[in-house]
Structures are given as structure tokens and as C-alpha cells.
From Swiss-Prot:
Lineage, highest ranks first: Bacteria, Pseudomonadati, Pseudomonadota, Gammaproteobacteria, Aeromonadales
Transmembrane segments: 498-517, 522-541
Protein name: Probable protein kinase UbiB
GO biological process terms, semicolon-separated: regulation of ubiquinone biosynthetic process; ubiquinone biosynthetic process
GO cellular component: plasma membrane
Membrane topology: Multi-pass membrane protein
Any one GO molecular-function label of the UniProt entry: ATP binding
Family indicated by similarity: Belongs to the ABC1 family. UbiB subfamily.
Gene: ubiB
Top-level division of the source organism's lineage: Bacteria
Localization annotation: Cell inner membrane
Pathways per UniProt: Cofactor biosynthesis; ubiquinone biosynthesis [regulation]
Length: 546
């Protein structure tokens, strides 16, 4: 550990002690490193005696800085791991970081692009439009056509800081996993590793550019979602250049109402966008919190969502989509047996899971929820309760489902904030049923035939030759097999004869030795020994002949 890392570790431990995090663990369960730290750093007192545990943890993350704040924000979405009071407090974390100076941003952009800003852009504003822990955004115009753009640039020298903090977080996670018996359910090492992958992905803006291009292509011409254009020729790992958009923040209800927005349709559009991404495209924006969603000023009677910051996306394969759709339909029909069977069939829980017990556990958790009217039921919380129940039956963490459940909670929360009477089930059901209709039945068969038709059209002329070649190889392999079988039988026969001769030789040897000890039978003993030698010689020759 370097002196700088040791200093940072001391700072982390100091903050945890000052926020009273160690006191949240009962004394009898406290690991010895925690007790040692508290006794060794006796001058660091708990400054948060009167606060609940959620507030203490939130304040600790805020004091630890932007990397830990982002980690806390990620944890707030993992309601399958954290108690509700802690998750709700962590959801209040805000990524408030002072901007770095415009001159540093200019140098970073020019170093990445290999030319001066004035070569490519006009009206570059050194005062950032927005600032966050990893990057900040500046406005400008493209010199070639005057289009308004935003330039997102990674903070200078942020990568070594992130990597150092991640190493310390991994070390702390290993300590917690080793010394805190109750940490097994929280899986601290897995959670930190998941965060490490997420934040390192965010450092590569080319990845975000690719995600935005894919999402924009999926919704070309859509009345539901608009994704700003990315100017790839000016994008690098540390610089992202895209179209500047103007819109109303989706969380600004007053401004939306003042603009005459159709709030019911806007809320339903959010659900439409989510389920279209999941079931049509298998590619969804997985960071749809209010800060990343705007609403177009134009056509408020037919509102258009605008999505930005595509750094985090999720994907689902065909099987995951099928199981997910069937799960939704099954538990809204209260078919808990089918829900349990689907979890086993999908491989989400071990194949030896007792379906009867699993069904009963699901029924116990979900039946009280479905006593409410469907319009009051939270899709996200149904999934959350379902995953928590499945985890008791050793369900493995499914990263794509965790992202999906987090995004669904965002969409649902936004939708009900915009229009409290939103019936998510009625809005989503047509998408689920249509997708299932596309996947099973005559139409699905016809679609599969159409999808494979070009392949078979290409291969059909080759079919006679392939059949002939297959028959020829089969005939050749049959002859080869017959020869191998004949050789095997011959070898087995020789081996049997050799074993017989060796056995007779051994018997004659024993008889000869015995007769030699009897003076009246010396001649017979000599004959037996000679016979034994002859049998062994023949047996040895037979084993050598193959």
C-alpha cells in the first residue's frame, strides 16, 4: 500500500467512526478490526448519536466523496440487498461536485482530438453547463454547419483516483465478508465488483456514444422517445460530442403543466418506451432517473420523451425475455405454480429446487400484494419481492434482471409522479401479450421461416452434394468401424489364448517345483518345468504379436 493509499484508508476509517457506522453493528457481532480501530483512534467520537442508521450511512457516503456517492446511489437501487430505510436514505444522495476549470477542460479536449478547439468548434463556453463526479459538459457549435452541440469531457486525472478508491473498497469488502457473519446475504465482494465494472465503463465515452447510437436507431421516427444525435467523428474515449437538446426536466411537474403537457399520455409513454426497449429491442437505457429524462417543448398534446446519458444499458436474450413475459402474465393471473416452474426452467434457481415449497413461498409473499387493485400495484416491487423470495432458494444474481428491476422502479416512479392514476398493468399488458403472440403459435412459426429463408435459399443448391458427401463419409466410416471391430476381436482372442497359456505355465511351474522336492519324481518335475517354460514362451510371443 502506497503512502497516499494509506492516508486515504485512514480518512475512510475516520469518517466511518465519526459517523458511528461501527455502532450500527451489535457489540457481540463486531469484527475485531472494527473494535481495534475504535480503540486505537479513541479521539474520533461518534458525531451522529441521534440519527437513524440510514441517515448515518448516507452522511458517511457524502463525506467520503464522489466515488462513494456514486456507489451509494447504485446501492440505493439494490433493494433486494438493503433494508427499505437505508435504501430510501441512499436515494437522497446527490452527485454535487464543483466543476473543474474551463481551461483544464479545453486542454483535455484538445489533447484527445489532436487539434485546437477553434479548428472544429465555434462559441466554446468554458463555463460548464453541468458538472458531475466523472465528467462535465460544455456547449459549443460545430464549425462546419453551426449546429449547437454539447461536449462531455472526463475529469483530468480522475482515473488513478477512481482506481485507488476501488482498491480500497475491494479491501474493505473482503474484510466485511470475512469478519461480519451477517454479510453473506449482502454479498459485499460481488456488489463492489459490479460497481467497479459500471464506473470503469463510464470512463470510456466511446461506449456511451455506441449505446446512444444504438438507442437512437431503435427509436428513429418514434413519437415516444428521442435520443440526441452523436457526432462520432469528434468522439474519443475522454470526449463525447452530441446534439444539444432543449426540454423540460421530467421532474418539473409545474413547468410541464404550464406548457399544457398531456400528463396521462406522458406517463403512459414512459411505460411504452420501457417495454418497447425490453421486449422489442432487447436493449434498454438502464439509468432512466429524472436527471436523464427531458420532455420536448413542442407538441405538448403529444409529448415526446428525450433520453440522455446512455452510459449504462441492459440487454436481455430471447430466453430471458420469454421467461420474464411469462412470469409477468403468470403472477398477474395468480398462477404461482407456473411462476415457480419458470424460475426452475430458466435456470435462475437450481434444478433440484422443490417446486411445491417454492410455489408456497411465492404465494405467501405475493398474495397479499394482489389483494390491492391492479392500478395500485407496483411492478417493480412485485419483481423485488419475487427476487428476494427466489434468493432464499439459492437464486443466483442475474445482473440483467437487477438492471431491469432498477429501471422499472424508475419508470414506474416517474409515471405515477406525472399521473398518480397510472395503471401500469393496463398499459403494459398489450406489449407483453403481443410479444408472447409473436413468440408462440402459427405467426411465430411463420416469422421463424421468414427469418431463416435467406439462409436456406443460399444452402439449398448445395444440399444434394452435402447429402452425397455425408453418405460417402458414412460408408467410409462403416468400413473403418468394421475393420476396427475385427481387429479388436482378433486382439481379444490372442489375449485370451495368451492368458490361458500363461495360466497353464504357472500351474506346471508350481507342479514342477513340488515334484523336484520329491526325489522319486525328479524326472516328472523336470518335464513340468520344461512345459511351463514352453507355455510362457508361447504366451509371451502371442502378447508380443499384437
Amino acid at each position: 500500500m502506497t503512502p497516499k493509499e494509506f492516508k486515504r484508508l485512514y480518512r475512510i476509517i475516520s469518517i466511518l467512526l465519526e459517523q458511528g457506522i461501527d455502532e450500527l453493528v451489535p457489540a457481540r457481532y463486531q469484527p475485531w478490526p472494527g473494535r481495534l480501530a475504535r480503540r486505537s483512534l479513541f479521539w474520533l467520537k461518534n458525531k451522529r448519536q441521534g440519527l437513524n442508521r440510514g441517515a448515518r450511512i448516507r452522511l458517511a457516503f457524502e463525506a467520503l466523496g464522489p466515488i462513494f456517492i456514486k456507489f451509494g446511489q447504485m446501492l440505493s437501487t439494490r433493494r433486494d440487498l438493503l433494508p427499505p430505510d437505508i435504501a430510501e436514505e441512499l436515494a437522497l444522495l446527490q452527485d454535487r461536485v464543483p466543476p473543474f476549470c474551463g481551461q483544464a477542460a479545453r486542454r483535455q479536449i484538445e489533447a484527445s482530438l489532436g487539434c485546437t478547439i477553434e479548428t472544429l468548434f465555434d462559441d466554446f463556453d468554458e463555463t460548464p453547463l453541468a458538472s458531475a463526479s466523472i465528467a462535465q459538459v460544455h456547449t459549443a457549435r460545430l464549425k462546419e454547419n453551426g449546429r449547437e452541440i454539447v461536449i462531455k469531457v472526463i475529469r483530468p486525472d480522475i482515473e488513478p483516483v477512481i482506481e485507488a478508491d476501488l482498491r480500497l473498497m475491494q479491501a474493505l469488502a473482503r474484510l466485511v465478508a470475512r469478519f461480519v457473519p451477517q454479510s453473506g446475504r449482502l454479498r459485499p465482494i460481488e456488489v463492489v465488483e459490479e460497481y467497479r465494472k459500471t464506473i470503469l465503463d463510464e470512463l470510456n465515452l466511446m461506449r456511451e456514444a455506441a449505446n446512444a447510437i444504438q438507442l437512437r436507431r431503435n427509436f428513429t421516427g418514434s413519437e415516444a422517445l428521442y435520443v440526441p444525435e452523436v457526432f462520432t467523428e469528434h468522439c474519443r474515449e475522454q470526449v463525447l460530442v452530441m446534439e444539444r437538446i432543449y426540454g423540460i426536466p421530467v421532474s418539473d411537474i409545474a413547468a410541464l403543466e404550464a406548457n399544457g403537457t398531456n400528463m396521462k399520455l406522458l406517463a403512459e409513454r414512459g411505460v411504452e418506451v420501457f417495454f418497447t426497449q425490453v421486449f422489442r429491442d432487447s436493449f434498454f437505457h438502464a439509468d432512466m432517473h429524472p436527471g436523464n429524462i427531458f420532455v420536448s417543448y413542442e407538441h405538448p398534446e403529444n409529448p415526446l420523451w428525450i433520453g440522455i446519458d446512455c452510459g449504462i444499458v441492459g440487454t436481455l436474450n430471447r430466453e430471458d425475455k420469454r421467461y420474464l413475459a411469462e412470469n409477468f402474465l403468470a403472477f398477474f393471473n395468480r398462477d404461482y405454480r407456473r411462476v415457480a416452474e419458470l424460475h426452475v426452467e430458466s435456470g435462475w434457481v437450481p434444478p433440484d429446487t422443490k417446486v411445491d415449497e417454492f410455489e408456497f413461498a411465492i404465494r405467501t409473499v405475493l398474495e397479499p400484494i394482489f389483494e390491492k387493485p391492479l392500478s395500485e400495484i407496483s411492478f417493480g416491487h412485485v419483481l423485488l419481492n419475487l427476487f428476494n423470495t427466489a434468493r432464499r432458494f439459492n437464486m443466483q444474481v442475474q445482473p440483467q434482471l437487477v438492471l431491469l428491476q432498477k429501471t422499472l422502479l424508475y419508470v414506474e416512479g416517474l409515471g405515477r409522479q406525472l399521473y398518480p392514476q397510472l395503471d401500469l398493468w393496463q398499459t403494459a399488458k398489450p406489449y407483453l401479450e403481443n410479444w408472447m403472440y409473436q413468440q408462440v403459435g402459427p405467426k411465430a412459426v411463420w416469422n421463424a421461416i421468414k427469418e431463416k429463408a435467406p439462409f436456406w435459399a443460399e444452402k439449398l443448391p448445395e444440399l444434394p452434394e452435402l447429402v452425397y458427401e455425408t453418405l460417402r463419409q458414412t460408408r467410409h466410416q462403416q468400413r473403418h468401424f468394421d475393420q476396427m471391430f475385427a481387429d479388436f476381436r482378433r486382439h481379444s482372442r490372442r489375449q485370451g489364448q495368451a492368458r490361458y497359456l500363461l495360466g497353464v505355465g504357472a500351474s506346471l511351474l508350481l507342479a514342477g517345483v513340488f515334484l523336484l522336492t520329491q526325489k522319486q519324481h525328479i524326472e516328472w518335475g523336470q518335464i513340468s518345468l520344461a512345459g511351463a517354460g514352453l507355455c510362457w514362451l508361447l504366451g509371451w510371443l502371442r502378447t508380443r504379436s499384437h
